[in-house]
Curated annotation (Swiss-Prot):
Binding site for Mg(2+) 4: 234
UniProt GO molecular function: fructose 1,6-bisphosphate 1-phosphatase activity; fructose-bisphosphate aldolase activity; magnesium ion binding; oxidoreductase activity
Gene: fbp
Domain of life from the UniProt record: Bacteria
Pathway recorded for this protein: Carbohydrate biosynthesis; gluconeogenesis
Lineage, broadest ranks: Bacteria, Thermotogati, Deinococcota, Deinococci, Thermales
Positions of Mg(2+) 3 binding: 233-235
Keyword Metal-binding assigned: yes
Name under which the protein is recorded: Fructose-1,6-bisphosphate aldolase/phosphatase
Annotated organism of origin: Thermus thermophilus (strain ATCC BAA-163 / DSM 7039 / HB27)
Similarity annotation: Belongs to the FBP aldolase/phosphatase family.
Length: 363
């Protein structure tokens, strides 16, 4: 059976600042989506990460389907109206256009979609991040799909040994989407050359070279390229298929336990570690530490199993404690050096404007 998974995410308002959506907003979004299960949709699941609401939709309409995207737009718009009625902060923040134009690409919400023929057992993960950048998944996915130090299946499984093809997007290209495809392990150094710069380059998708099957897809939208100004971080979502011809689910744990430094945090202008958290966790009041959650599902004839929260077991409490130490050390450095993003990546323009004013005082 050919199935499409669509993951769509947006910040449409939150309680007391950038924390979490209200119960009423979540309920309205889920109500709109649930009305279409059994009609337009095969199944659906709604959750949040920080103040971002995430929709997981299963259907047979293919990627970029107008009806599916219109449903997500309707859910986010109606949720926004509830947020406005409640006086929530940033109501409708990620909805950058007034009207739906056929699909959600370019309208603000993050979108990751994948169409594939369902295997007899089809395990997959949904990853969702908040308070960070599109390239935040670069290192974890690189290590899981290309580094046998972290993904032992690359050595142990004949299905994985031929490696994976990485499709990488140049986020600096604003006129059109610009991609390059590189094969691991042969082009490993070239892949690393690009992915090290998570501000400019981001993984868009990953493919099995032996089977030609898509393994992963990641959203790559930059909100400021749409709005022309800072309107929030470009936190990614991803769909990752696991097991058999792909890395095992548990091989994705150690790569996220690294908690790499990424762009984001308060005002989207700092480097901080990416903390693995449970789904439905509010954004941290400790400078909005960048966060990622992961839910694993099994899929059968387009129907979703109940999810398992990948970052909820006791091991992750120890990981989070170390992430907090990394975050505290970086924040102790305040505005100085690598603690704050370079000028071209700062989401707020205050420093650039101040520098222009100061230029007149130089002699």
């Amino acid at each position: 059976m050919k199935v499409t998974l669509s993951v769509l995410k947006a910040d449409i308002g939150s309680v007391g600042g950038h924390t979490l959506p209200s119960r009423k907003v979540l309920a309205k979004v889920e109500e709109v989506v649930r009305e279409e299960v059994g009609r337009l949709l095969l199944d659906a699941y709604v959750f949040h990460i920080g103040d971002d609401i995430v929709l997981l939709l299963s259907h047979t309409r293919g990627v970029r389907n107008q009806e599916v995207h219109a449903l997500a737009w309707k859910a986010f718009r109606e949720g926004t109206e509830v947020a406005r009625a409640e006086g929530l902060y940033g109501a409708g923040q990620d909805l950058l256009k007034d009207a739906f134009t056929g699909n959600l690409h370019g309208l603000g919400p993050q979108v990751a979609e994948m169409e594939f023929t369902e295997r007899p057992a089809e395990p997959f993960m949904v990853l969702a991040a908040d308070k960070t950048e599109p390239g935040a998944f670069n290192l974890p996915l690189y290590l899981a799909f290309a580094d046998p130090m972290y993904s032992s299946g690359l050595l142990l499984s004949p299905e994985l040994r031929p490696g994976f093809r990485f499709r990488i997007m140049d986020l600096a290209q604003t006129e059109r989407d610009s991609y390059i495809e590189l094969d691991a392990p042969e082009r490993l150094y070239d892949i690393a050359t690009l992915l090290r710069d998570s501000h400019r380059f981001a993984i868009e998708s990953i493919w099995s070279r032996k089977h030609g099957e898509q393994a992963a897809v990641v959203s790559t939208t930059r909100l400021r390229n749409i709005a022309g100004r800072y309107v929030g971080k470009d936190d990614p979502v991803a769909i990752v298929r696991t097991q058999k011809i792909f890395p095992a689910t548990e091989e994705f744990g150690p790569v996220f336990a690294l908690a790499p430094y990424v762009a984001g945090d308060t005002r989207g202008s700092h480097h901080m570690p990416l903390m693995p958290v449970r789904a439905n966790t509010p954004a941290s009041t400790f400078f909005c530490v960048p966060m990622v959650c992961g839910l694993a599902f099994s899929l059968r004839e387009g129907r979703l199993s109940e999810p398992v929260d990948l970052f909820a077991d006791p091991v992750w409490e120890a990981v989070r404690a170390k992430v907090v130490e990394k975050a505290q050390e970086m924040r102790r450095q305040g505005f100085y050096g690598p603690a704050m993003l370079p000028m071209e990546e700062l989401e707020y323009t205050g420093i650039a404007e101040r520098l222009k004013a100061l230029e007149r005082e130089f002699s």
